[in-house]
Amino acid sequence: PGAEKWQGILDALKEEYALASLQILPQCHIVNDVIQNKKEVGFIARKGKDVKSRLEQVPGISDKTIVFIYLGDMGAQSVQWENLQQLEDMVFLTRDPLPKNVANLFVLDDRFLYQDLIASSDIVCTKAGYSTLSTAFAHDKPVISCSRENFHEFATMRDYMSDKQIGLIMDSTKFFSCDWEDDIRKALKFSVKGKVPLNGEDEVMKIIDCILKG
């Protein structure tokens, strides 16, 4: 949508991209016919460490299903966060600037890294974006998300998660009303392990090494 407004810039980018001798495509990529030589690789992800022992020092977190939330600026102000309190056997962790008056929603600061919180959670609730999906899958965490309008990659990510049974897209009405329980329990039954290639970094390094060696 709106591409015609930027047609001059898009044409210039297409011309520049066409000069590339190789395009490296991690998982969930969009098919294009601009660059002829392509190489698909695994996900490229940020690796974290499990910090659940630190998290469980906070009263109310121990022995609960842990859901990590990352939405950034994607309509978070429209979500009825107070309804999360109805999910009494779950806790929700986030680094986003969300309300701090919801009993089971913990807003953490930068002492906790995003990738560590993902590694320590049971499931990830996020906007469908590459970096969060790849980090979740690298730690064998299933994902729940909602639709993203005007985000061209969304359809590819939605189909990828559906085909591999590693995540699901919630109905928008349920998402914004925080009616998440059924979808969380459904997604928790998904297994990510062994379903997606995670060796993107190694493959890219090999490609670069071959190029440098000529």
How should these model regions be labeled?
Residues 22-24, 39-41, 93, 106, ...:
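Hydrophobic/aromatic beta-strand patches that form the interior of the parallel beta-sheet core
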